[in-house]
């Protein structure tokens, strides 16, 4: 029997499943798209010149839907960030997901960039479930989000659950989710599994947990930046009955499924930023509903192979035309400036220098994970700056002593959340030393920084509140606020005819030198 079904706004035909027959199911998935709408230069690859793009990914998804029966599409969170997401309060991201035909998503930490109330309003307007089984209003058992859902297509019923882990929670500005309690996931997941198991053919868990992803354009090619999926393996082992787990937050790409040795759960994740589409095809036994065969991979989104989907392009063009002010050029650079996650970087140095110049503070700091895009060579538009630092945050001036500064830098050198980018200091470190004892020397203008020295520092409010695990920042006293980070940077560009690439060398790793000497 042939029946019609809806997917991404177009009506397709698919063959229904006869009871007792083996079933083929294709699960497509994304994570950490983070409003990465356009293809980028694939300078780390030798098989394609460009990679990614939402419109190009949509074409790939539509092609797979035409070729394969019973296709489902999921996302594991972090759909918001960037200029257009900010200007629309996240509305554009959801509209694109509707056009692409998503069946369900989990909540990511970026969904709270505009506060819990804005996100609640947006998620309640979309036709697919936005899931967070461990989200509750503080001091109550009242859920903030739907825990799970059943998606049925052609007689195949999939139970989908969403959760967020504690590392992802710590990446949210605390005041933005103050009324919410994000609880440990295992109990919430098991509760949903128990409710779903007898009602569905397959259970899919969408997670947003593990270590924070490294914010670097070519992260997939740098072995130092590869994250593990231990948190997902552990959760899949702690909860009985999960067939498939699609993860997010760590951008820990899995070229093929990882199988939990105790439960058999298939675990996958992409590298994020819409550079790859996750693919997992399953064969289910028609009688037992057990997975008898699987084939999983990550498909690079090659723009030369998959052209842009017209509906997505039209939506992007319409929204961009609504905000012509962000396309205004505010300055130019002498060369492209790149981000690095665990190294001193051009973009990080520039922002820290800007904070010092604009505030008059002694020292400038910015967390490497906040820098979301490289700055192009030549003309720089407002949208480029908003996409580089997409958060609604102020530059805060604080009074800190030398001990607090040193502890912040030791925390940075664990690389748990990337390297803290700085201005006004000279730092030498040795990664072979134990954590929190890696600083070899810390000076300002050639003078050693002592524990009781007093400094004014300028940094984003996220750090000021202790975000990214920096406990010494909230200990210090706030003495000023010079405005939004993006506005401070825009004014700097407007005030300089050509913005030069800052000199490197303010943070020096002597580990390699020691190894050579030995």
Positions of predicted regions on the chain:
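Glycine-rich phosphate/diphosphate-binding loops and the adjacent beta-loop-alpha structural elements
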Residues: 324-346
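C-terminal catalytic subdomain
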Residues: 378-419
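Glycine- and small-hydrophobic-enriched helix-loop-helix hairpins
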Residues: 465-518
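Charge-dense polyanion-binding interfaces
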Residues: 417-444
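Hydrophobic, well-ordered secondary-structure elements that form the walls
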Residues: 355, 401, 457
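Low-complexity, glycine/alanine/valine/leucine- and proline-rich hydrophobic stretches
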Residues: 440-463, 483-484
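Acidic, metal/ion-coordinating pockets
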Residues: 5-311, 318-321, 342-354, 364, ...
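A glycine-rich phosphate-binding loop feature that marks nucleotide/adenosyl-phosphate handling sites
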Residues: 297-301, 332-337, 365-378, 423-433, ...
